[in-house]
Amino acid sequence: MYIGVISMRYAKALLAYADEKGTEDTVYEEAGILADSFSRIPELRQALDNPVLPAETKLKLICEAAGGGKVSEELKRFVELVLEERREKFLQFMIMSYIDLYRKQKNISVGKITTVCPVAEEVVNRIRALVVEKTHGTVEFKTKIDPKLEGGFIFEIGTYRLDASVANQIKRVKQQFIAKNRRIV
């Protein structure tokens, strides 16, 4: 079976189970923390792939990574099922699929603002209001600091990207000079 098929089946099952219990929001928060742990700590994935570690140890590891040991009963039971079925190597993909399914169900868009210096909360809230108005859903924002931009910002949401950075403007001017003169300036 393909990774995507397996992870999507388990993610749909987790979403249905969490919906039934009314804890889909809590599971979503824990899944976000766990997904972040997978990306920040590559050893976590290696530990899950290790056949020598017992399932109880893997369960404790995952619970610790998902919220300091205080995870919801639904997520804990889901992880127990995954470990029982020996599908732990797909767990990261299952969690990412759950996050995607939850966002689709709740109409949540994820936006990213990249700037040279930290952005004031007031500016983020104004951008959030504009995006909510256009998408008719909620928006989660991530901010990133990148000194290579030299000024301006890059805003991304879904497949849309608005690059208003100074670095991009300099690049476009340089391309125009090259196109006109047929030589590098």
From Swiss-Prot:
F(1)F(0) ATP synthase produces ATP from ADP in the presence of a proton or sodium gradient. F-type ATPases consist of two structural domains, F(1) containing the extramembraneous catalytic core and F(0) containing the membrane proton channel, linked together by a central stalk and a peripheral stalk. During catalysis, ATP synthesis in the catalytic domain of F(1) is coupled via a rotary mechanism of the central stalk subunits to proton translocation. This protein is part of the stalk that links CF(0) to CF(1). It either transmits conformational changes from CF(0) to CF(1) or is implicated in proton conduction. Pfam families: OSCP. Gene3D superfamilies: N-terminal domain of the delta subunit of the F1F0-ATP synthase. One of its GO terms (molecular function) is proton-transporting ATP synthase activity, rotational mechanism. The gene is atpH. It is found in: Cell inner membrane. It comes from the Bacteria. It is a peripheral membrane protein. GO terms for cellular component: plasma membrane; proton-transporting ATP synthase complex. HAMAP family: ATP_synth_delta_bact. Belongs to the ATPase delta chain family. The lineage of its organism: Bacteria, Pseudomonadati, Bacteroidota, Bacteroidia, Bacteroidales. Keywords: ATP synthesis, Cell inner membrane, Cell membrane, CF(1), Hydrogen ion transport, Ion transport, Membrane, Transport. F-type ATPases have 2 components, F(1) - the catalytic core - and F(0) - the membrane proton channel. F(1) has five subunits: alpha(3), beta(3), gamma(1), delta(1), epsilon(1). F(0) has three main subunits: a(1), b(2) and c(10-14). The alpha and beta chains form an alternating ring which encloses part of the gamma chain. F(1) is attached to F(0) by a central stalk formed by the gamma and epsilon chains, while a peripheral stalk is formed by the delta and b chains. This is ATP synthase subunit delta.
